[in-house]
Amino acid sequence: MDANVSARINLMRILLISGIVFVHVPYNPQWSPFLGNYGMLDWLRVFLGESLFRIGVPCLSAISGYLLFRRGLADFDYWKTLKTKARTVLLPFLIWSGSFFVVVYAIQRQGLGFGYLPDTINATPRQWLSMAFAVEATPVNLPLYFLRDLMLCILLSPLLALLVSRYPRVTLLALLAYAILPLPNGIFLKKSILFGFSAGIYASLHGVNIKMLDRFAAPIAAGFLAIAVVIAVGLYYTGPDFPLWLDMALRLTSIAGIIGSWAISELLVRTRFGEKLGRGSGLSFWIFCGHYPLLVLFWMIWNRTGLSYYPLFYFTAPFIAIAILVASHNLVRRLAPDLLAVLTGSRTGAKRMATQPPQGAQAGYSPQQR
């Protein structure tokens, strides 16, 4: 893999995960963006949280599928992969998700936190398993359902690779229908993750030149953003109970965002800002796992201040959360690098990327980064 692709993948990860932070900003029903109380600001909330940044989940899963099989099916060692992913995905998921459940339970035992998070005190042991580890439903650390579904994709990866290699069109069309049609989720909590992961496998196994559309990056990016704007307008005027056709269009747009976000990465990676963001990967995982507890904490504090201008909270809380997570990541990296390695699945950061070869040279990913 050349250094440009490697940097763009890291850039996409940090941008998409930062965008996902906006998706998870909490609000009360009286401050729903679909009420239009704040006019254009509410539409912007819908655009960011319900349209544009919904591309994050399928895009991130596509990256995972692509990297997992980028050396081909013949060199794929399933048992070695499971062992690696147990350390790089499963263990961090269990720690981040389980520890937040314990914190929430302890807080609610003191009579705090009710209404902000699921009721852990009166839940059954079966419900606890989902709250802590997303066994049947989303966990209390909401975004981490992605890691749970990603592990399922990894467990199914030999079967998915076999189907995608032998019957690519039928397989991808079937998974696309599963993702966008109102079908039961089955064992997955988010259906688009399976399609994104399989699309990434397809790109690897069939040798797709993922840079072939780079010369059209600007019009592709503009077209995707225009579609996201149109979808946001429809959501704003019909939400929160969207008509079925619009909900399907939203799901399809989020999947199309795989191509759109890749085009955007081509435009950004050559800028100084994009080059800097493309140097590391551990930070994005840290932000992904840690942002939701911070947002809930900020929301609890906000509701005690008596302030009523919700846009102030919406447009400041994500940036404060990201700033805290960047600072804490740097602090833990300096003071407890072994702990950081466990919490981020042994992902390397800027130090490794600082020595990456120049553009056009080959840049590999460690099993941890894949």
Swiss-Prot record:
Please give an example of a GO cellular component term from this record.
plasma membrane
- Pfam families this protein is in? Acyl_transf_3 (PF01757)
Coarsely, its chief localization is membrane
Say yes or no: keyword Transmembrane helix present.
yes
Q: Could you tell me where this protein is found in the cell?
A: Cell membrane
Q: Which PANTHER family match?
A: O-ACETYLTRANSFERASE WECH
Record protein name field: Succinoglycan biosynthesis protein ExoH
GO MF, one annotated term: O-acetyltransferase activity
According to its record, how does it sit in the membrane? Answer: Multi-pass membrane protein
Annotated segments matching region Disordered: 350-370
User: Per its database record, what is this protein's job?
Assistant: Required for the succinyl modification of the seventh sugar (glucose) of the octasaccharide subunit of succinoglycan (EPS I).
What are the protein's UniProt keywords?
Cell membrane, Exopolysaccharide synthesis, Membrane, Plasmid, Transmembrane, Transmembrane helix
Pathway(s) served? Glycan metabolism; exopolysaccharide biosynthesis
What's this protein's family per the entry? Belongs to the acyltransferase 3 family.
Q: Where are the transmembrane segments?
A: 14-34, 46-66, 88-108, 144-164, 170-190, 193-213, 216-236, 244-264, 282-302, 307-327
Stored InterPro entries: Acyl_transf_3_dom
Q: Name one GO biological process term.
A: enterobacterial common antigen biosynthetic process
